[in-house]
Amino acid sequence: MTLLRPAQRGASFQLMTLTIHRLSGTLGAEIHGADLIGGLSNAAFDEIHQAFLDHKVIVLRGQNGLSPDQQKAFARRFGTLNIHPYVKGMDDHPELMEIIKEPDEKTNFGGGWHSDMSFLEEPALGSVLHAIDVPPYGGDTLFADQQAAYDRLSDGLKKTLEGMTAIHTASKEYGADGYSAAVRQSMDAKSAPDAPEYEHPVIRTHPETGRKGLFINPAFALRFAGWSRKESRPLLNYLFDLSREERNTCRVRWQEGDVTMWDNRCVWHYALNDYHGHRRHMRRATINGDKPR
């Protein structure tokens, strides 16, 4: 079956047994009718995979009771799974991270714009996050489309950035004074003051769709290759500001049982920390990717 492209669709449309509703005009869609617990047919998986490529962020509603093994089985249909180098996974499922904020904690994990694992030589393809316990309000996740941000650049700036590379490292976030290293109350995270640095293109071509997008982020992009941090800061900040403009974003309002998947090759995300006094418990699988080009 040939799937419709987003430009051919309205705000809501039916594909076989799945119903897909767009979350914004730029990116994001929620999907009803998928059963990750019972398992997906090849046809249903193909629909979900296409929606993932089309919308970059997909929310699979109604997956209450999804087990760790079932979550891993779904994620593995996209690729092999990553074991986080700085955050301890579950004892029986090291590929899965439990992201927990207890009612008495003030700092959350992922509370700033970033792309998962861009500090690796082969950054993550995508992340699959399951909502186990959600607060009565707040705790939403924002997403920002880096291909849309690239499309808004002038031709002159696109030409300037083409061929440039940036240095990515975990030391900004997981260093001794880094934000993520401070989140050690309900999560076992270690510091990485001597984390390696890897060089990635500033403009990345998506390996499956061929679309170009920015591939830098505030958490892990340290500087442009061959530039000092001071020299890099003005241009990086301009690109960061453009990337997170509201017109490039969508918002996921979590419901218990949701499974949200996003494409780290072209999307940033930001977990909002506006639910103090309430518990939030998520479980994440991260899918290995390839070397950016």
Where are these regions (language model features)?
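Leucine-biased recognition of intrinsically disordered, low-complexity hydrophobic segments
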Residues: 3-4, 15
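Generic N-terminal simple sequence motifs
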Residues: 1-2, 197
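Fe(II)/2-oxoglutarate oxygenase catalytic core
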Residues: 13-14, 18-261, 265-293
